[in-house]
Amino acid sequence: MDIQYLMRQAKKLEKAMADAKEKLAEIAVEAESGGGLVKVAMNGKCEITRLTVDPKAIDPNDKALLEDLVTAAVNAAVEKARTAADESMSKATGGIKIPGIAG
């Protein structure tokens, strides 16, 4: 096999992966917990872009409940963001799994 051809293909893959990584910030996912009392929006880089808490979820006597709701919503958003990022990177790499690239 031609080594120059392989090098060109590797450069194309590298460029596609770099482009896909840049686009991760454009991916938007949302998750909620407590029947919508806490909502989290996140991008494909797992950065929280918005967090909303319904006033009904704020009970000074039950701080643990709010903490649990926020934790659950963030974890759900992270899972969705990772899945979306993995799908985006998979498209860029033609389905080749490259450890540590997304998520």
Curated annotation (Swiss-Prot):
Which Gene Ontology terms of cellular component type are present? bacterial nucleoid; cytosol
InterPro entries from the xrefs? Answer: YbaB-like_sf (IPR036894), YbaB/EbfC (IPR004401)
Residue stretches spanning the membrane: none
Where located?
Answer: Cytoplasm, Nucleoid
Give one GO term, molecular function aspect.
Answer: DNA binding
Q: Does the keyword Cytoplasm apply?
A: yes
Give the signal peptide range. none
Q: Which UniProt keywords apply?
A: Cytoplasm, DNA-binding
Asked if the keyword Ribosomal protein belongs to this entry, the reply reads no
What the protein does?
A: Binds to DNA and alters its conformation. May be involved in regulation of gene expression, nucleoid organization and DNA protection.
Quaternary assembly: Homodimer.
The entry sums up its family as follows: Belongs to the YbaB/EbfC family.
NCBIfam families for this protein: DNA_YbaB_EbfC (TIGR00103)
- Check the record and name the HAMAP family matching this protein: DNA_YbaB_EbfC (MF_00274)
Q: Which PANTHER family match?
A: NUCLEOID-ASSOCIATED PROTEIN YBAB (PTHR33449:SF1)
User: Can you say what this protein is called?
Assistant: Nucleoid-associated protein AnaeK_3694
Species annotation: Anaeromyxobacter sp. (strain K)
